[in-house]
């Protein structure tokens, strides 16, 4: 009966560590995505915000360590090596404490992140240059076109751009242009566009722009909240797997009475 219980515990621990390994790969992939994505609002933030870049490196580091721990846990469970199981438990405890600490720091710095985000976008709009090729500008054009918004708080944010407001005709940001429901084109127009049929009108007045009037702040924050929900779900899932792994490793470790290093696989 006892040996059967140990065998069940051993293979359950192996299964949990396999899931743990996969979740570690997901966390690592998320960190790589933050650094590599060049076509969404994440690109705007990570290019200008050292905090987000640092967070991406933390995700990559935690993901890599989690995968390593999952691998070591599988070896320790299958071969019933007591020292590996004890080391595995200690590392799991440290990772769990680090995750809780990082989550708390992120939660209490949400206000600072939102403020930093607004400053980044406002500066980007003010310094936008239609004649310059810039990946950051392209990313913001993509956001405005896909989210169907204009500016940060409202389209009036674009009145801070000197190049745009010095145009003699009615000119507006191309990516802000209102599109019909039937227009499902994925291409994004960049730079500034002149409104048709306004050659005789003097001055560039924002009220005449055929653009979305709603700012991107609320929509982007909603998008971030949705993605944060995914991150939170993954984090909770990892924490549950970690706790189960800790419990199972202790149970198995208690039943392994003697150290037998001959069970450790030779590579």
UniProtKB/Swiss-Prot annotation:
Forms homooligomers. Interacts directly with IGSF8. Interacts with EGFR. Interacts with VEGFA and PDGFB. Interacts with ITGA4. Interacts with ITGA6; this interaction reduces ITGA6 cell surface expression. Interacts with ITGB1. Interacts with TLR4; this interaction inhibits TLR4-mediated signaling pathway. Interacts with TLR9. Interacts with PLAUR. Residues 33-53, 111-228 are extracellular. It is found in: Cell membrane; Cytoplasmic vesicle, Phagosome. This is CD82 antigen. Glycans are attached at residues 129, 157, 198. One of its GO terms (cellular component) is phagocytic vesicle. InterPro entries: Tetraspanin/Peripherin (IPR018499), Tetraspanin_animals (IPR000301), Tetraspanin_CS (IPR018503), Tetraspanin_EC2_sf (IPR008952). Palmitoylated. Palmitoylation contributes to oligomerization and surface expression. It comes from the Eukaryota. It is a multi-pass membrane protein. The keyword Manganese does not apply. Residues 1-11, 73-83, 251-267 are cytoplasmic. It holds the Pfam family Tetraspanin. Disulfide bonds: none annotated. Belongs to the tetraspanin (TM4SF) family. It comes from Homo sapiens (Human). The keyword Glycoprotein applies. A lipid is attached at residues 5, 74 (S-palmitoyl cysteine). The chain crosses the membrane at residues 12-32, 54-72, 84-110, 229-250. Structural component of specialized membrane microdomains known as tetraspanin-enriched microdomains (TERMs), which act as platforms for receptor clustering and signaling. Participates thereby in diverse biological functions such as cell signal transduction, adhesion, migration and protein trafficking. Acts as a attenuator of EGF signaling, facilitating ligand-induced endocytosis of the receptor and its subsequent desensitization. Mechanistically, modulates ligand-induced ubiquitination and trafficking of EGFR via E3 ligase CBL phosphorylation by PKC.
């Amino acid at each position: 009966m006892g040996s059967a219980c140990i065998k069940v515990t051993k293979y359950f621990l192996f299964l949990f560590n396999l899931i743990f390994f996969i979740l570690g790969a997901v966390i690592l992939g998320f960190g790589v995505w933050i650094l590599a994505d060049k076509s969404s609002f994440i690109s705007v933030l990570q290019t200008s915000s050292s905090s987000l870049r640092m967070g991406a490196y933390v995700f990559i580091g935690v993901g890599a360590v989690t995968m390593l721990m999952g691998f070591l846990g599988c070896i320790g469970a299958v071969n019933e090596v007591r020292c590996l199981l004890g080391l595995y438990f200690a590392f799991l405890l440290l990772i769990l404490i680090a995750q809780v600490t990082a989550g708390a720091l992120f939660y209490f710095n949400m206000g600072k992140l939102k403020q930093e985000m607004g400053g980044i976008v406002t500066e980007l709009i003010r310094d936008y240059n239609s004649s310059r090729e810039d990946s950051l500008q392209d990313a913001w054009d993509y956001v405005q076109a896909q989210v169907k918004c204009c500016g940060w708080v409202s389209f009036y944010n674009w009145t801070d751009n000197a190049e745009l407001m010095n145009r003699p005709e009615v000119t507006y940001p191309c990516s802000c242009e209102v599109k019909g429901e039937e227009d499902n084109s994925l291409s994004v127009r960049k730079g500034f566009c002149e409104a048709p049929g306004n050659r005789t009108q003097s001055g560039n007045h924002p009220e005449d722009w055929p653009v979305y009037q709603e700012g991107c702040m609320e929509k982007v924050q909603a998008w971030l909240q949705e993605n944060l929900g995914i991150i939170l779900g993954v984090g909770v899932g990892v924490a549950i797997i970690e706790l189960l792994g800790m419990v199972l490793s202790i149970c198995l470790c208690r039943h392994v009475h003697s150290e037998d290093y001959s069970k450790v696989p030779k590579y």
